[in-house]
Amino acid sequence: IGVRLVGSEMCIRDRSIHYRLVPTAFNTFVGIGPYEKGLFHILDIKGTAVDTIGEQPYRDEAERNVPELARAMAYQGKIIISPKGNSLVHAIFMSPIISFYKLSLANIELLKSHVDCYPTYKPELGNNSYASAMSRSNILGFIDVAVTDRYVYALLSGKSTRESGLSAFTGNVIRVYDWNGDLLKIYTCNTDLTALCVSADDSIMYAIGLVEDYELLVANLK
C-alpha cells in the first residue's frame, strides 16, 4: 500500500485507516486519512464514525474527477488542534497548502485556505493497492506545525527534491498565522529545521536544526 503513515492509527470500529486523529473540545475526534470519500472523519468518544466532512483538495474540475482516495495520497499532511480544542489547522506536506477551520459539535467550517501551488502526480489505484506517484519537481509544503492559543507556526519547505535533494525535507521559513488563517509574519532562519515547538506564551521557539549535526536550537521571540 502506497501510504506514508506518520502517527497513524487504525480505528477498529469504523474500519478506516487514519493518518492522524485529534481530540476536540466536543468529546469527538477528527481524523484525516486515505478515505474513499471525504477530507475529515468525525468520530465519537467510542471511536465510531459519525460523519464525513469536505472533500480532498483539487486544482480544477479535471482533478476533481480523480478518485478521492488517490487525491488523499497526493495531499498528505497533518492536522493540529488548538489548545482549546475548537479550531483546526490542516497543513499539507506534499504541497504548500494550509487551511484553517472552526469546529463545532457537528461541523467543521473552513475559514481560510492559502494555496501556493498544487502538486503534479499520477494516481495508481489497483484492486489491493493505492498510491499516487509524485513528481520530483513538486514544491514540498509544510514540514511541521506548532500551535499556541494565539498563533499557528508553520515550518515551510518550499523546495523540490529534484533541485534540493534531501534538503527539501527541511525548511528555514516559518509562517505565523492567527487561528482565523490570517498571515501575520514570516521568520527566516539561518539554519535548516526539521521540527519546532513554541512556548505557551509565544516567547520562546524550540527547533531541531542542522548545524554541524542535528541540534536543539532555541530562539527568543519577544
Provide a role label for each language-model segment.
Residues 1-7, 11-12:
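Single conserved hydrophobic/aromatic residue that forms the stacking wall/gate
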Residues 135-176:
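Loop/turn-rich, solvent-exposed surfaces of beta-rich toroidal or solenoidal domains
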Residues 115-128, 179-200:
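Conserved blade-ending motifs and adjacent loop-strand segments that build the rim/top face
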Residues 4, 40-46, 167-181, 220:
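Beta-propeller blade signature
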Residues 203-222:
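Blade-level signature of beta-propeller repeat domains, shared across WD40, Kelch, NHL, RCC1
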Residues 107-145:
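Flexible internal linker/loop segments at domain or repeat junctions
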Residues 19-25, 69-84, 137-148, 197-200:
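Structural signature of eukaryotic scaffold interfaces centered on beta-propeller domains
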